[in-house]
Amino acid sequence: DSLGSRGLGDVYKRQVGMFIGICIPFLISSITMKAVGDAAFEMINEIRRQFREISGLMEGKADPDSEKCVEIATTAALKKMMLPGIIAVAMPPIIGFGLGAVALGGMLAGGLLGCVALALFMANAGGAWDNAKKYVEKGNFGGKGSDTHAAAVVGDTVGDPFKDTSGPSMNILINVMAMVSLVISSLLPISGMLF
C-alpha cells in the first residue's frame, strides 16, 4: 500500500513545499545581509586607499574621488542581488515541476508565512536598535563614549540592514514567487515529475 494510493502523498508534498517555502526567506535575508556587509567592506577599503594615495585629503585640501565610491555601491547592489533574484524566480518552477502543483501551493503558503514573520521582525528590530542608539546618544545610560553606546552602535550596525535591506526585500520575494507561480500554473503537473 503506497502513500499515493491512500491519498497521503499530496499531504506530504504540501508539507515539504511549506518547509521549503519557510526556509527561502531566511536564505534570502542571509544573502542580503552578507551583501550589505561585503559592500561596506569594499567601500571602507576604497576610502582607506583614497586617504593613502590622494595627498591633502586628510587635511581637507583635496577632493575625494566620490565617483569611485558610487561605482562600488552601484556595482555591489547589482551583482550581490543577482543570486536572490535567481532564487526567487527559479524556486517556483523547480518545486512546481519537480514536486507538483500541490507542493508549489505549500511552498507559497510557507513562503508567505516566513516572509511576513521576517519582515515584521526585521523592520521592528532594526528600528528599535536604531532608536536605542539615538536614545543613548541623548545622554541616557551613560551617553556617548560609554560601553552602552558602543553596544548600541553595534546594534545599529546590524539594525540598519535589517530595516533597510532584508526586511523590505521580503515583500519583493513573495510577490515574485507568487507571480512566477501564476505564470507557470497552467503548465504544472498535479503530481510532479520527481515524486
Regions found by a protein language model. Name each.
Residues 26, 30, 82, 97-131, ...:
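C-terminal amphipathic alpha-helical interaction region
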Residues 1-8, 12:
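Single conserved hydrophobic/aromatic residue that forms the stacking wall/gate
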Residues 42-77, 133-172:
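Non-transmembrane, extramembrane segments of multi-pass ion/lipid transporters
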Residues 17-31, 88-96, 111-118, 178-190:
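Hydrophobic core segments of alpha-helical transmembrane domains in multi-pass membrane transport
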Residues 97-105, 186-195:
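Helix-coil boundary and interhelical linker segments in multi-pass alpha-helical membrane proteins
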Residues 28-41, 122-137, 141, 167-192:
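Membrane-helix cytosolic exit motif
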Residues 20, 38-45:
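Terminal amphipathic helices with adjacent charged low-complexity linkers/tails
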Residues 15, 60-104, 108-109, 153, ...:
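C-terminal transmembrane helical bundles of large multi-pass transporters
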